[in-house]
Amino acid sequence: MMRALWTAASGMTAQQYNVDTIANNLSNVNTTGFKKIRAEFEDLIYQTHNRAGTPATENTLRPLGNQVGHGTKIAATQRIFEQGKMQSTNLLTDVAIEGDGFYKILLPDGTYAYTRDGSFKIDSNRELVTSQGYKVLPNILFPEEYIQNSITISEEGIVSVKIDTSNEPIELGQIEISRFINPAGLSAIGSNLFKETAGSGQEIAGIPGSEGMGRLRQGILEMSNVSIAEEMVTMIVAQRAYEINSKAIQTSDNMLGIANNLKRQ
């Protein structure tokens, strides 16, 4: 009975973590480029009383074993990198990735991060940056006399503008994107950014539209891939599982009470 208490408690703990994950998904339903997270579970250690295949009698073997589990725990949180919905913004510096890939970002400490959020801006230094002011790599520098409504970004990432003294567009550079063998192994650091890890593998940089890379879509943003209906259903299931485990604790407690009262009867 004591084992049942701890087993059910592990179930409640796991489901609480599950609800926390679902709540995070729902809170980011409008976050640009956000990828939903799914909690994965695994069972805990088993206590074996009899193993399958051991002698039952002198001439027979046990066809089945006798094992009692000790509950569950969160094994991992899997980030689902499905394509989010495309939303038109008509802003020339908004660029979505359609397909695989991440934008490479230079952080203030000199390290690199990666993002699917293409809501870019042009800062006071005339450089293409993220909403947080981090440089997009390779660096794109706009000339002083560029015409703001002339910015074009091709599917292959080529950035062009017109200047006051010429009607011909000038190429400023090309946005590259990076992909990973295991993008789910990237480490989220907030602000829609990810860091490379040993689990994700090293970045594979390339030109948009080539070698398995996605293409760029100017004037469009990729929205969150969270489905409110799906998350609400998952939350109801998690809530019921939490409730059932709490009932198991109550039942085990009642059984302990009955056992404790045996001497008094």
From Swiss-Prot:
GO terms for cellular component: bacterial-type flagellum basal body, distal rod. GO terms for biological process: bacterial-type flagellum-dependent swarming motility. It is found in: Bacterial flagellum basal body. Pfam families: Flg_bb_rod, Flg_bbr_C, LlgE_F_G_D1. Disulfide bonds: none annotated. Its main location: other. Keywords: Bacterial flagellum. PROSITE patterns: FLAGELLA_BB_ROD. The basal body constitutes a major portion of the flagellar organelle and consists of four rings (L,P,S, and M) mounted on a central rod. The rod consists of about 26 subunits of FlgG in the distal portion, and FlgB, FlgC and FlgF are thought to build up the proximal portion of the rod with about 6 subunits each. Belongs to the flagella basal body rod proteins family. This is Flagellar basal-body rod protein FlgG. It comes from Borreliella burgdorferi (strain ATCC 35210 / DSM 4680 / CIP 102532 / B31) (Borrelia burgdorferi).
